[in-house]
Amino acid sequence: AAWEKFDVIFSEEVERACLIHGDLNVGNIMIGRGYRLTGFIDPLNSMYADREYDLFQFDNLTGKRFFLSETYRRKFGASQYCDQKLAFYGLWNEVFCYIKSGVLVDLIMDPLVKNMGRRLAEL
């Protein structure tokens, strides 16, 4: 079912690719005094891609506590199907990790599959 909606979800053309971190989560964001952003670490998956790719991890771990997704969307906006794209990106990332490691972590994969189902139902 997910692939049947792929063309709808990714129908909005990406204006331009930008350099993304590829694994942007709260553990890879450096914050200094006064809560100022000082840098990013662990850029092993950096690439030029859709700028929204990095957003899928903003709600992982403790990201929701820091309102990262909401802050980003307020400052930069989001595509029409951003939530559905993020569900795809999150699921793809876990499949990619599985391919690289051979380890499937149900604790991570199950919520991603459920989220994908919820996002598809919104279409």
Language-model-derived ranges and their functions:
Residues 3, 65-69, 88, 109, ...:
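A structural signal for well-ordered alpha-helical scaffolds and beta->alpha junctions
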Residues 74, 97-123:
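ATP/Mg2+ or Mg2+-diphosphate-binding catalytic cores
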Residues 12, 64, 78-81, 103-108:
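Alpha-helical structural elements of signaling/regulatory helical domains
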Residues 1-22, 32-33, 115-116:
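An alpha-helical support segment within catalytic cores of ATP-dependent transferases
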Residues 86-96:
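Hydrophobic alpha-helical segments that form the core
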Residues 17-20, 25-84:
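Active-site Asp-x-Gly
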Residues 10, 59, 99-102:
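Hydrophobic residues in alpha-helical segments
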